[in-house]
A protein has these predicted regions:
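N-terminal glycine-/serine-/threonine-rich beta1-alpha1-beta2 phosphate-ribose binding loop
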Residues: 2-106
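Charged, alpha-helix-enriched surfaces in structured cytosolic catalytic cores
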Residues: 22, 143, 147, 159, ...
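Short acidic, glycine/serine/threonine-rich loops at helix termini
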Residues: 28-29, 61-64, 122-125, 147-154, ...
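Glycine-rich beta-alpha junction loops
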Residues: 52-57, 142-144, 167-173
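General beta-strand structural signal in soluble alpha/beta enzymes
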Residues: 70-71, 86-87, 111-113, 136-140, ...
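Rossmann-fold NAD(P)-binding glycine/threonine-rich loop
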Residues: 91-106, 113-154
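Glycine-enriched alpha-helix->loop->beta-strand junction motifs that scaffold or abut catalytic
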Residues: 106-109, 170
Length: 180
């Protein structure tokens, strides 16, 4: 992360969310409504400092009046007070790609559920993350949201994995369950 950011583990994690549709809006609602639960002495709090979406006037079920609003989602990555960017815009290019690349290049951690972005640009984004020391988190983009990446990365680190097979997609799982 950039040198002017507070590295304290007691200061709240400052989050900017790009895209307030179904998923991004629910992330923001959960972070907003569960803010008190996340202020426990053993848990670092979370503060939404900025958001961007197509329309400012949409009722999203949470108050955005005290959150900085950006018309241009890519501009979120230029803020010096953001620790994590949550990208929920969608698409593999354009503003989503610009936002994620700029964020990672600046050492800002990125969370995304954007399958297209990762499929088209995953190698480049992973390289940018590694070079800057930023985390590129994409657990929600694969395996129907189950913690498959974390399990493989952390839980099976001592095992020699040569292959993984299965249908790890929420849509396919739903269709197969319905067919039973």
């Amino acid at each position: 992360m950039s040198s002017d950011k507070t590295e304290s583990h007691t200061a709240p994690l400052r989050v900017a969310i790009a895209g307030l549709g179904v998923v991004g809006g629910e992330v923001a609602r959960q972070l907003t409504h569960r803010a008190d639960a996340m202020k426990a002495p053993t848990v670092r709090g979370v503060e939404i400092v900025a958001v961007s979406a197509r329309s400012r006037d949409t009722d999203r079920g949470f108050d955005i009046s005290n959150i900085d609003w950006y018309e241009d989602a890519a501009a979120l990555a230029t803020r010096d007070d953001v620790d994590v960017i949550v990208e929920m815009i969608g698409g593999h290019d354009g503003v989503a790609l610009e936002l994620v690349k700029t964020s990672l290049s600046r050492g800002i951690h990125v969370v995304t559920a954007n399958k297209a972005l990762l499929a088209h640009n995953g190698t480049e984004l992973a390289r940018l993350a590694e070079e800057s020391g930023a985390a590129l988190m994409f657990e929600a983009a694969i395996a129907g949201g189950i913690p498959a990446v974390k399990t493989l990365r952390e839980g099976l680190v001592g095992n020699e994995m040569t292959r993984l097979a299965g249908i790890l997609n929420g849509t396919c799982n739903y269709i197969l369950t319905t067919m039973e």
